[in-house]
């Protein structure tokens, strides 16, 4: 458990800016077409965030951004008939694409799922027993083979509401079978990345995430047996069954949990979503318990300058999984850290938000192992390994999470300031 409360939080380093030596690679572009669109709630027209957008019959997919916008790049050689759209609390939506024309600026409407509380049998009101059964079924419900995930990763740092750092990458994530719940056997390799940093002298305090892309390993709470979902860790929490919800046109148990004991390190509180029929974990929303600020700081902060005071405000996570061909796979991870910093001799503090997210865009089972010397290390800083290079066609055929309008605006400002 302590492993999750340190490495998986995404350790932060706060320090004065120094020069760095980046590394990055480039791939060849191929022939492809691009599908773009926006997903909205049909009832109230609200834009929907973190909606799964996938291509049935393939492993290709992405999620919508905070503006409800998505894009998918697909090879011309792929035969696709449409898209499948899924989101928690909504009925799945299908979009027909009989040809590859007119696939830009789609508007996709989703209907909220009806409340089916009366149609689902509560698990004997034994919330912990339900979680235990789902843990026992992990080797059956999740991949029994090794897999190589292609994923897009982004981390941003905001000082108040202003972006001061943006970095992105396409990564490979190799995972062993889920019957092996030991994360040290999984590896991450950077394929391609880029970064931007504010050149303002007022932003000389830099904030970086240690081990950022490795959240695909340590925050995969189903695969990582040292995280929340072990029989031993269950003893630290109280569990309660909440009202069920719909996800992927399937009913989900919702189990909330809170700390029931005090340990030497910070625990978590949140909700687990468990498929009604398969008893597979499909989603987890949880946050670091902030009741003891000293423990919270120990979980988050790796290094800071002398005289800097660090006050955590919130650390939250979202981890989602998606079923395909009878097995459930990692789909999306998000980590948000909010904190305040001030110097002992200054009157006012500055608020910061560090946001990291990763979406799996493709998956294959036939691949060469990632060599140890090329694997992203547990305590490496992702930002230091990529170059400051920000042309419009940088990602070529790679699928990404579309930047929000506010992020695009911030990137344009940072580019102008860096010239």
Language-model segments: which ranges?
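Surface-exposed, low-complexity/disordered segments
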Residues: 109-237, 248-251, 297-301, 305-419
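Hydrophobic beta-strand segments
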Residues: 51-55, 68, 83, 122
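Short Pro-Gly-centered beta-turn/loop motif in secreted/extracellular proteins
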Residues: 45, 72-80
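Extended beta-strand-rich segments in extracellular/periplasmic secretory proteins, especially
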Residues: 225-276, 280-288, 322-323, 328
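Structural motif
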Residues: 30-48
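Short, acidic Ser/Thr/Gly-rich low-complexity loop/linker segments typical of extracellular
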Residues: 59-69
């Amino acid at each position: 458990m302590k492993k999750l409360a340190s490495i998986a939080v995404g350790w932060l380093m706060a320090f004065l800016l120094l020069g760095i030596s980046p590394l990055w690679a480039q791939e060849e572009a191929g022939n492809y077409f691009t599908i773009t669109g926006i997903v909205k709630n049909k009832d109230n027209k609200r834009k929907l965030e973190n909606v799964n957008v996938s291509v049935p019959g393939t492993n290709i997919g992405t999620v919508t951004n905070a503006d409800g916008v998505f894009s998918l790049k697909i090879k011309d050689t792929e035969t696709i008939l449409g898209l499948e759209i899924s989101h928690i609390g909504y009925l799945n939506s299908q979009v027909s694409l009989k040809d590859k024309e007119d696939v830009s600026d789609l508007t996709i409407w989703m209907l909220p799922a009806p409340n089916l509380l009366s149609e689902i049998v509560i698990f004997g009101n034994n919330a912990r027993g339900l979680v235990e059964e789902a843990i026992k079924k992990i080797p059956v419900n999740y991949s029994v083979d090794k897999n190589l995930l292609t994923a897009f990763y982004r981390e941003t740092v905001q000082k108040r509401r202003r972006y001061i750092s943006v970095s992105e990458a396409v990564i490979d994530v190799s995972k062993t079978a889920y019957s092996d719940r030991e994360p040290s056997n999984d590896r991450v390799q950077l394929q391609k990345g880029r970064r931007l940093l504010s050149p303002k002298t007022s932003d000389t305090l830099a904030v970086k995430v240690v081990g950022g892309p490795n959240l695909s390993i340590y925050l995969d709470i189903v695969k990582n047996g040292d995280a929340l979902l072990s029989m031993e860790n269950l003893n630290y929490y109280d569990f309660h069954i909440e009202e069920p919800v719909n996800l992927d046109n399937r009913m989900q148990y919702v189990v909330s949990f809170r700390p029931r004991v005090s340990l030497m390190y910070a625990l978590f509180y949140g909700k687990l979503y468990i498929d009604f029929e398969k008893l597979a974990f499909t989603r987890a929303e949880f946050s670091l318990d902030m009741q003891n600020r000293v423990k919270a700081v120990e979980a988050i902060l790796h290094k800071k300058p002398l005289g800097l005071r660090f006050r955590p405000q919130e650390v939250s996570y979202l981890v989602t999984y998606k079923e395909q061909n009878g097995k459930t796979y990692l789909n999306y991870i998000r980590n948000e850290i909010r904190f305040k910093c001030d110097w002992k001799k200054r009157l006012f503090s500055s608020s910061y938000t560090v946001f990291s997210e990763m979406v799996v865009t493709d998956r294959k089972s036939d691949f060469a192992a990632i060599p140890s010397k090329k694997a992203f290390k547990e305590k490496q800083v992702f930002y230091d390994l990529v170059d400051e290079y920000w042309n419009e066609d940088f990602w070529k055929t790679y699928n990404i999470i579309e930047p929000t309008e506010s992020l695009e605006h911030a990137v344009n400002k940072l580019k102008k300031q860096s010239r």
